[in-house]
Amino acid sequence: CKPDMDLMFVSGVNHMFFHGTPYSPKEAKWPGWKFYASIDMSPTNNIWQDAPAFFEYITRCQSFLQMGKPDNDFLVYLPVYDMWQEQPGRLLLFSIHDMAKRAPKFIETVHTISNCGYDMDYISDNFVKSTRCVNGKLLTKGGTSYKAIIIPAVKLMPSEILGHLLKLAQAGATIIFTENYPQDVPGYGKLEARRKGFAQLQKQLPEIASFNETVATPYQKGIIITGNNYQSALEKSGVVPEEMKTRYGLQCIRRSHADGHHYFISS
């Protein structure tokens, strides 16, 4: 249980529930009534005698992880339109167990960023539109700040999102495009009109010879970084990676508070 719990803690979960524990009457034969989809936190589980110590560990950890605010380095744009386009067939159902098949490129991107020593949160279109730049940092609607936003090899992007990213850069934010600029709009509704507007926005992006070289281009008050190499591009942002991740192979999550920062660290 503890390794799984630690994985959830470093992933940002800070409030644990043992949900779905089934009722079992006293007269039920051992091991009692069970349900496959719930946790078996009951006297018939051999962890039961150690449960108080385990609960104390959870309480202490999540108490600290509920203090302060999240302090992850980057926002990563979720390329949902690319994911939808790349799926075979037309019926897409929610599936928590097939994400490696549904989003292999995005998963690889997330692991690459993490292995470079950084933490991130994902962001969708609606939250991008409500994000603003304050003192060079990205401030989301929920009040959490980030040092830059990463656009990971996105091919399809709505015009309003690309336009808002450019406005954020103009206001002082750092925008990182990896592998390529967005190339087209998603969907077919009013396609020609939307493509025309999208093309006008594309012309406002910095002209670069190739994504093979990492380039940081000043863009009014902000910076637009382009390149294929994540480590080089992220270094250009000026964000310092966590050495405990890059050098020692540890996993951690960082939170900020009035007096500084605190960490949860797992080996």
Language-model regions: role of each:
Residues 1-267:
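Carbohydrate-binding surfaces of carbohydrate-active enzymes
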